[in-house]
């Protein structure tokens, strides 16, 4: 979070209206995922919620997808993703207030995107050489 804060501060300087979406509403809290038996990422201290009253959650809304999934400020999402967080607004069962520290998922997504670009450009091996196959 220490690395995310300067990115957010710069975004707020450029777009002061973002400040209203940056109020922490949930961080480290021992609890289960709603409707499930497994522990929430909040229980491990790797997730936080921002401005819960302003951010739709799939269990509270009948809209699927929710229009705010497209209109949520990209600067906020980019600031968190640049430092290894994923945003719950990209999920089918969306949680727009939720950011979760999962650098391994960000890394994997970047690798897969790179492989897709290589294959699209005809640079993939097309076989199993070095374990690399053309992606479908």
Pin down the residues of each PLM region.
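Cell-envelope/glycan interface and biosynthesis
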Residues: 1-91
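Low-complexity, Gly/Ser/Thr/Pro-rich intrinsically disordered linker/tail segments
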Residues: 82, 95-136
């Amino acid at each position: 979070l220490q690395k995310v804060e300067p990115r957010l501060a710069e975004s707020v300087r450029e777009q002061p209206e973002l400040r209203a979406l940056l109020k922490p509403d949930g961080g480290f809290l021992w609890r289960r995922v709603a409707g499930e038996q497994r522990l929430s990422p909040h229980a491990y201290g790797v997730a936080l919620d921002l401005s819960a009253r302003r951010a739709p959650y799939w269990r509270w809304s009948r809209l699927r997808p929710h229009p705010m999934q497209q209109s949520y400020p990209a600067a906020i999402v980019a600031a968190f993703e640049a430092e290894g967080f994923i945003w719950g607004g990209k999920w089918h069962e969306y949680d727009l207030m939720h950011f979760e520290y999962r650098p391994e998922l960000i890394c994997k997504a970047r690798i897969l995107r790179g492989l897709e670009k290589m294959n699209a450009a005809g640079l993939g091996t097309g076989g199993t050489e070095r374990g690399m196959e053309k992606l479908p």
